[in-house]
Amino acid sequence: MYTKNEEELQSLGERLGYLLEKNDVLILTGELGAGKTTFTKGLAKGLQITQMIKSPTYTIVREYEGRLPLYHLDVYRIEGDADSIDLDEFLFGGGVTVIEWGNLLGDALPDTYLELEILKEEDGRRLHFQAKGSRAEKLLEELQHGV
């Protein structure tokens, strides 16, 4: 998938947000400034969250209320020490969990999640989705085919 600008990236996030269910997990990867938080802003809109979405870089976790709670984590600063936060509280907290830099968690990742790698390109963003587990596969299918 490819998006030409921030508006398209947010719009795709919003489409995914409409499809999300309780305990869905999304892992976002990409270099600094790739658009991870921008994508999450759209996703939050799809979850009917009206609060301003900010990067959790320095706070590690931000929580928002909408159709489902959104737990927005940035684990870059915990340097692979998943034990420094109670991941289970978010992963099984009845909401949607978005983890920026989630690939750094290694074995601490849940069994099922949808991963999105955002790559900067000159005129936009190249998006690579990878589904792990049947729920994530279904979610990706719905996102790609508008089911």
Where are these regions (language model features)?
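N-terminal pre-Walker A segment at the start of P-loop NTPase domains
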Residues: 1-15
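P-loop (Walker A) phosphate-binding loop of NTP-binding proteins
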Residues: 31
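Short beta-strand-centered segment that lines the nucleotide-binding/catalytic pocket of NTP-utilizing
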Residues: 49-64
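Conserved nucleotide-sensing/catalytic segment adjacent to the nucleotide-binding pocket
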Residues: 63-103
